[in-house]
Each structure stands twice: as C-alpha cells, then as structure tokens.
Amino acid sequence: MIEKIWSGESPLWRLLLPLSWLYGLVSGAIRLCYKLKLKRAWRAPVPVVVVGNLTAGGNGKTPVVVWLVEQLQQRGIRVGVVSRGYGGKAESYPLLLSADTTTAQAGDEPVLIYQRTGAPVAVSPVRSDAVKAILAQHPDVQIIVTDDGLQHYRLARDVEIVVIDGVRRFGNGWWLPAGPMRERAGRLKSVDAVIVNGGVPRSGEIPMHLLPGQAVNLRTGTRCDVAQLEHVVAIAGIGHPPRFFATLKMCGVQPEKCVPLADHQSLNHADVSALVSAGQTLVMTEKDAVKCRAFAEENWWYLPVDAQLSGDEPAKLLAQLTSLASGH
C-alpha cells in the first residue's frame, strides 16, 4: 500500500499532505539553522564523505558504501565507516564493531560493511561520537565514510553523494509520509555526486547497476552459480525486496516462492526455517545472511551483489576523495 501511495497510484497521499507539510517545515528549518550557523556542526579532523538518500526505502546505498570503501582501500587509503546503526540496540554508544558484534547490537548494514571491507566501523545515533571512537582506536584513518546521514547536519561533511533508485526515482515528489521524500529533489543541486541505481540516468548522473556474484552457502562458504540451485524459496529483508527477486530471475532462477520481509526485521531459526519445505533451497540477500549465519541450515544460501558504476565520473570522484584523504 505504501508503495502505491508514494508513487501516486493511490489518492490516499492527499490525506497525508498536512503531515508532509509539517515534516517539510521542520526538516527545512533544521537545515537552515545549520546553513546560517545558528547551530554548529561538528567537524572531524579528517575528511567526511556522506553517502545518503533523498528518499526513504532501499536505493542501493549500502553497495555504494562498500564499493567506495574498497576502491579507496585499493588506492592505499585507510577508511573508517560510521552509521546510526538503525535496527540495532547496543548497551552503550558509540559502539566500535568487532568480529563478535551482532546485528542485534549494531544493525544489519554496519555488520555487512564490516564483514565485507574489514574497515573500522562504529555506530551511534550521534555520528560525531562514532567518528571520535574510530579515530581514538584507529588514529591512522585518513577519511570517514558515513553510511546514510545526508540529513544529519550535526556532522559537517566535505563531500555529499546521493544514491537514487533509477526506476522509482522520487515517486509523487512529496515529503514523508504522503511521499517518499526526506528532502525535495532540488537538494541534488548542492551535492557532489548523484548515483542512479538502474533505470535511465539523466544528465550529470552516474549510472550504476548491481552485479550479482555467485551464491554462497551460509554454513560452508561454498560458492556456485545461483542458477544451479533448485526449488528455490527467496526471501529479502531490504528496503525494496522486489529488486532482489528481479535479480534472481535475471540470473535464471524462477523461485517457487518469494517472501518479502520488513527492512531490518529481526530473524530467528524458527521463523526462517518455517519458510522452507523439505527439498527446497532458501536464497536470501547478503544483508539477511549476516543475521542468519549463526543458525543457518545446509540448504541456505545468499546472493551477494556489487555496485558497478559506469562512465568517467567514478574515476574523477575517486581521484577527488584520494586527494582529500592524502592530505591527512
């Protein structure tokens, strides 16, 4: 239902307009306060890069963060990552992730990023505290990438990158809750790069696609072509589950059942195993896998995806960030 409201297909969005005006007024006032320096943002001693969204829902932001961190690491840059840790609840903040940190403590995305990149990752509702925690334990870090947080103006930033779903884009264009917008589309004029996941990019936008890898067994780490798996049940607890199901079909998989889950939904063995019958194979997103690995069964697999950016702009962006980081 919410997708139909935000896309404009359902007329119910008009009933939510008063709340949207209030949201827009408050969020605009907050940004203006920082712009006029009525409120002061905390500036880190190293460059900060924000990777965020203008809309609610899944846009492919986390794969972009992983891509960015890995690309900078390949250039010899020491990167730290901070996040709010949405969906997790730690005993205290800031929380610096370790090999033992669970998604229940830190949230799905931070654990995924930590496991994929090996970069120092810290979470806190106050992102500046997360930055301080990383720099205290890893003083050699040269640049901070913040996963989400475009609207978290308490943390000053040097570069802003926005990720857009190229198919859904901005829906009906209204602020939450009548539409999907956290900020209006005009905000794009002030950011440094716009990355478009799928669809048809517009002038000045960087095209991106999510490239699926081989399926990975949660228990053994064995890899295989996902099309070799039979009697597949697909689950996806991400911001936009249909994207994952479409990716599976693009890979030649015709799932017997597709089960969309809520983003950041807590998972346990009983609930997940109940989705699969005897003889069926479970295939999930990598984000779900970080929550299920501890209790996975032999027939549970996940399909990792990597961000693939096209054109000349990604190289220019990386050169800019490398230059920024090299000065610290």
From Swiss-Prot:
Disulphide bond pairs: none
EC number: 2.7.1.130
Pathway assignment: Glycolipid biosynthesis; lipid IV(A) biosynthesis; lipid IV(A) from (3R)-3-hydroxytetradecanoyl-[acyl-carrier-protein] and UDP-N-acetyl-alpha-D-glucosamine: step 6/6
Kinase recorded as keyword: yes
Annotated positions binding ATP: 55-62
Alphabetized GO MF terms: ATP binding; tetraacyldisaccharide 4'-kinase activity
GO biological process entries: lipid A biosynthetic process; lipopolysaccharide core region biosynthetic process
Reaction catalysis annotation: a lipid A disaccharide + ATP = a lipid IVA + ADP + H(+)
UniProtKB keywords: ATP-binding, Kinase, Lipid A biosynthesis, Lipid biosynthesis, Lipid metabolism, Nucleotide-binding, Transferase
Gene Ontology, cellular component aspect: plasma membrane
Similarity field: Belongs to the LpxK family.
Known function: Transfers the gamma-phosphate of ATP to the 4'-position of a tetraacyldisaccharide 1-phosphate intermediate (termed DS-1-P) to form tetraacyldisaccharide 1,4'-bis-phosphate (lipid IVA).
Protein name: Tetraacyldisaccharide 4'-kinase
Species: Escherichia coli O1:K1 / APEC
Originating gene: lpxK
